[in-house]
Amino acid sequence: MENYGLFIDVGNTSVKIGIGVIDRLLISYTLSTNNSLSGDTLGIQLLQCINHAEQVINKDITISSCMMSSVVPTMDTLLQYACERFLLCKPHIINQDFIIPLDNHYEEQCEVGADRLVAAYAARRLFPDSKSVVSVDYGTATTFDCVTDNTYLGGLICPGIKSSLQALYTNTAKLPSIILNTASKVPIIGKNTKTSLTHGFLFGFATMTEGIYSKLINVLDGPVTFVATGGFARDMANVVCCFDAVCPDLILDGLHLLWIDCLSKSYSL
């Protein structure tokens, strides 16, 4: 029977669910982060994801183990209950049950979010020929996480695109809703509010990214690989010139790689 792993990335805005086998991730899903849901409701949602995946690959799926990264502690207990009751497996939670195999140089190691460490680990594993790697995650916050050799050096935490836009909506009247994507490689001088907002946000964050990149390459040992991830990764990669790779589900990739490591070392999962 083939080994199937379940991978759960719990962020402040969304929960990403991945299902994979040894050699690859098969499929992923995105749910809204909602800690008011019951564990039973979350369990049913997990089963719905698995049932859909079975239809896609035309095979029965029995989850043998689960790896979870979470930055929302209130979701941990709910998802643990959901996995144990509905999937008959206990999720292994990063930084609780399993430690990322990077030399962590953060002053207070417990302060680093599991998502940042998993993304950094994935970037390190996926691009082994680079002396240094930087994962740039466009999530609720925009984070830059730096690894040289096998050492997690730390990083930068900047405002997030969506949360910044929501703050603007909250404090400003009459702003229209916008979709943050564009086919243009250069900013357009907006002649309406939607265009002004779209290009202001996209190219504003693009310039921030490129500015930080230009500083980091002077302090990191090279060569340096810059990797974009998160919900806005593809949109930002269209207007940012410094990315070497775009991996929208880098945290799921990292959980999958950690799962493979555990299986290869015969850890109990």
UniProtKB/Swiss-Prot annotation:
InterPro entries: ATPase_NBD, Type_III_PanK. Pathway: Cofactor biosynthesis; coenzyme A biosynthesis; CoA from (R)-pantothenate: step 1/5. It catalyses: (R)-pantothenate + ATP = (R)-4'-phosphopantothenate + ADP + H(+). One of its GO terms (cellular component) is cytoplasm. The active site is at 115 (proton acceptor). It holds the Pfam family Pan_kinase. A monovalent cation. Ammonium or potassium. It is an enzyme of class 2 (transferase). Its EC number is 2.7.1.33. It is found in: Cytoplasm. It comes from the Bacteria. Substrate binds at residues 106, 113-116, 193. Keywords: ATP-binding, Coenzyme A biosynthesis, Cytoplasm, Kinase, Metal-binding, Nucleotide-binding, Potassium, Transferase. CDD domains: ASKHA_NBD_PanK-III. Homodimer. Belongs to the type III pantothenate kinase family. Catalyzes the phosphorylation of pantothenate (Pan), the first step in CoA biosynthesis. NCBIfam families: baf, PRK13321.1. This is Type III pantothenate kinase.
